[in-house]
Amino acid sequence: MNVVILDTGCANLNSVKSAIARHGYEPKVSRDPDIVLLADKLFLPGVGTAQAAMDQVRERELFDLIKACTQPVLGICLGMQLLGRRSEESNGVDLLGIIDEDVPKMTDFGLPLPHMGWNRVYPQAGNRLFQGIEDGAYFYFVHSYAMPVNPWTIAQCNYGEPFTAAVQKDNFYGVQFHPERSGAAGAKLLKNFLEM
């Protein structure tokens, strides 16, 4: 199977690459349209700011390429947020617009921001991405912005208020947490995605 990690220039790809390799796949890191469009599975990781990430997406001519993908795509952390419409970061950043939902800063309920560490995730029953993962399993988060719960939410987390921990629209999936840092539950989620 052809697994590709999209080289957005704004992510530490080694941990994602290693996590995929543990399942017996050799992912390619690329932004070449021919390689990306022929991938069976595509990963869209991201760390840092939405502005820097979208600058890289445009500079590397990835905007239309990502939107043209028909294979399963998994956005991780900031990569999930990029699937949204607009981020409140940096006075507003236009995103890919695949999911018609904004990404606001998380509300301060007296809890520290960024939301960092282990938290429970509650998936919708029956979603293939969470098959075999117990309800309320712990995943590892590091973020200050989050997509609200919306019609495309497939898993929720609570940090002062509920937010989207995972999302799906058609072939595009996103997880706000880091599956590559989330132990057995994260490994199972990656396996589920790779075996779709």
From Swiss-Prot:
GO terms for cellular component: cytoplasm. IGPS catalyzes the conversion of PRFAR and glutamine to IGP, AICAR and glutamate. The HisH subunit catalyzes the hydrolysis of glutamine to glutamate and ammonia as part of the synthesis of IGP and AICAR. The resulting ammonia molecule is channeled to the active site of HisF. Its EC number is 4.3.2.10, 3.5.1.2. Residues 2-196 form the Glutamine amidotransferase type-1 domain. Pathway: Amino-acid biosynthesis; L-histidine biosynthesis; L-histidine from 5-phospho-alpha-D-ribose 1-diphosphate: step 5/9. This is Imidazole glycerol phosphate synthase subunit HisH. NCBIfam families: IMP_synth_hisH. Heterodimer of HisH and HisF. The active site is at residues 77, 178, 180.
